[in-house]
Amino acid sequence: MEPHHDGHILKVLPMLASNENFSRLTTAFVAGIAAHIIIFRRGEWDIAAARIPVGLFILQSCLFSYYLFVPGPPTSIYTALWLVGQITLGFIAGTTVSILSYRAFFHRLNSFPGPFPARLSMWYVTSLYAQNPDAFNTVRGLHQQYGDFVRTGPTELSVNHPDALQAVHSGRSECTKGPWYSMLHPFISLFAIRDKAEHSRRRKPWELAFRPNAVLEYLPALEKGTNELLEQVERRKGKSMDMTYWINLFTFDLTGRVAFSQEYECVKHNKRHPIMEINDSSNLVTGVVSHVVWLISFIKATPGLNANMKALIGFSEEQVQNRQKMQTSGQRDVFSWLWEDFKEQGMETPQSKLDLVADASLVIFAGSGTVAVTIIGCLYFLTSTSPDYLTQIRQELDTLDEINSHTLSKVQTLNAVINETLRLHYPALSGFQRQTPPGGLHIAGRYIPGNTNIKIPFYTLFLDERNFAEPEKFIPERWTTRKELVKNPEAFAPFLLGPYNCLGKSLALMQVRHVLVELIRRYEIVLAPGADPEKYWRERTDGFVMGLAPLDLAFTEREMAGF
């Protein structure tokens, strides 16, 4: 067998050297360059990426058939395969060389500084996130090295200028959502809609679901969930409790009740729902690979690799189906508003069903995670760095005639602690992708070309001395009695701005305030023996929502005043 194999190799070498083969390779190489310039440079190819190999295979099959069956001297299967391989190699080489040359030397973003490999491919920033779980610190380092405008990808900029938030995210901005939001296509949630008109239409039932009166209807669910959490704390008084674990159970349970009137009973049974494990692993993977949006297309289409994604979507479908079967006694939940709008549209299509499932997924996984990160962050600061604020909050609570969502919104120190936690412990550290309008965008006098993907790294922005004095210190007074420490109020918008702002803000804040107050007024809260707050801080990870290490606290009962 070996001599026969060597004979084939010896035959191949002169074939490569022949003028005919060189001409064929050159033609394919030039065709690859032309394909990049004429086709692949136009529009977005991210969500269509999985179809490109299919198209290439079809072309290869046509070429193979041509060489095998075209009239003329007979061509062996081996020779036909060799010729098709030559053309394919030349075409791919031409396309690749053209793409890399264009990005490295001729691209419209070449005037922006940044690591040279970032010009060539999003694999560079992907590798940063893969190697550094706290990639938000790495991005901050890039800005310290290169300045306010950093090229982090072939068509992507990271912008940390104080004016950037208003220019990119405000209501007057012409920026739209970028290709990142299409990665779960054809499942399109409200969060993923890139067309502003469609987003405005789909947003209406959400606005009804989160208006003040509707939010108050969710209060019984919040109280029930809080009581279940308090029961678990009561059983473990004086013992170590991992509040990262317990608060995540609490918010997941709460999301089930508020969104679908479903009972997951994670807190009650001290057990994580299986879907939480899948969501956690997906969150970590998403933080790494989502920078290469086209790769998500391949993952979605590949059996085995798409198992987690299918499980998350399947769970969301199950919640929708279960909720549709339920008969509620006038009690509203978030899904009831979405379902009502779905029926009123009167046009049930395959896409509208997918969108409904996507919206369900948005409520379940985005809502519970961000609230949990905020509550846990508050507990971290109140026990690890600034326990004196616990006393201040209790003193302010003691002055209230009653505790309810309205009075808690006025408790100065509590709300200052929440704001400062959102600044230093923001759930979405790396920000949200936007795309500049076709005519481009000016930020601080710097022109950014049209159709450029742009991200504002909130972690870096919130630690910028141009925006906040003593930015790395936890100082809640900057939101109350020392407002001079907030140098640029317009640089702080944790719930975003404009048409894409967070509709669930009032519900999220009600949840955070309620559970914190019930814990603070009932218990003395301290770090558990052996707890390592520095390890907690050091092990934060970047993802769709920030990943957190265990936060071990101990609770001992205290006397409550007046309630």
Swiss-Prot record:
Q: Which residues bind heme?
A: 502
Q: What pathway or pathways are given for this protein in its record? A: Alkaloid biosynthesis
Membrane-topology descriptor: Multi-pass membrane protein
Residue ranges that the Swiss-Prot or TrEMBL entry lists as coiled coil: none
Q: What's one GO-annotated cellular component? A: membrane
The region annotated as signal peptide is none
Biological process GO terms, please?
A: mycotoxin biosynthetic process
**Protein species of origin:** Penicillium fellutanum
Q: Which UniProt keywords apply?
A: Glycoprotein, Heme, Iron, Membrane, Metal-binding, Monooxygenase, Oxidoreductase, Transmembrane, Transmembrane helix
Q: Which EC class does it fall in?
A: oxidoreductase
Q: What InterPro entries does this protein map onto?
A: Cyt_P450, Cyt_P450_E_grp-IV, Cyt_P450_sf, Cytochrome_P450_monoxygenase
Q: Which family does it belong to?
A: Belongs to the cytochrome P450 family.
* Sugar attachment sites: 279, 419
Name the job this protein performs: Cytochrome P450 monooxygenase; part of the gene cluster that mediates the biosynthesis of paraherquamide, a fungal indole alkaloid that belongs to a family of natural products containing a characteristic bicyclo[2.2.2]diazaoctane core. The first steps in the biosynthesis of paraherquamide is the production of the beta-methyl-proline precursor from L-isoleucine. They require oxidation of a terminally hydroxylated L-isoleucine to the corresponding aldehyde by enzymes which have still to be identified.
Segments spanning the bilayer are 20-40, 52-72, 80-100, 362-382
Cofactor names from the entry are: heme
Per UniProt, subcellular location reads as: Membrane
Q: Which Pfam families match?
A: p450 (PF00067)
E.C. designation(s): 1.-.-.-
Q: What is this protein called?
A: Cytochrome P450 monooxygenase phqL
Matches recorded under Gene3D superfamilies = Cytochrome P450
**UniProt-recorded Gene Ontology molecular function terms:** heme binding; iron ion binding; monooxygenase activity; oxidoreductase activity, acting on paired donors, with incorporation or reduction of molecular oxygen
